[in-house]
Amino acid sequence: ALAYAYEELDKLAIAGDSRQMGTTLTLLYFHSNGCTAAHIGDSRIYHLRPSSHTILYKSRDHSLVYDLYQAGELTYEEMKTFPQKNVITRAMIAGDRSHPKPDVIHISDIQPGDYFYICSDGMLEQMEDEELLDVFSANVRDEEKRQMLISETSDNKDNHSAYIVHIKEVS
C-alpha cells in the first residue's frame, strides 16, 4: 500500500500536477495475528480499550513541536501555542525520492470492544487524551460517539478527518 501511494505521488510530480503536494499517512492492516499500524506525519493512530479506560497505543507525531517536547525544550502546555506547531518533520511528498519510512508497529492484544481511532491533527486540536477516552468509554452507540467527536472539533481551525474502527469480535 505504501509503495503504491508513493508511486501515485511520483506520477503527479512527473506530470507537473504536484504543486509541492504532500500528505500524511495512517494505515491499519488487520490480519490473523492482529493488526499492523503504520504512520508518517502528524495524523494519529490510537488503540483504545474502553473497558479499562485505557489508551493502549498512540502513534508518535513526526512534528517539530513533538521533537522539541521529547527533547525537553518545550512543556506539554507550550506545545499547544508554539508558533511552529504545524511543522511536520516527516511526510510523503510528491517527487521526493527519499521516500521517508513510516513508523510501523504490530498490535496483537486486540479484544472485542476495543476501538482504533485514526485522525488528522485537527481532530485533536482542542481535545486531550482523557477527553478522547471519555468519549470512547461513554455508554452510547457508536453514532453518538461520532457526534460527540464532531462537536468537540467544530471550532478547530485545522482540517479534520477521522475513522473509527470498533472491534466487534476477534477470531
Regions from the PLM with identified roles:
Residues 1-171:
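PP2C/PPM-type serine/threonine phosphatase catalytic domain
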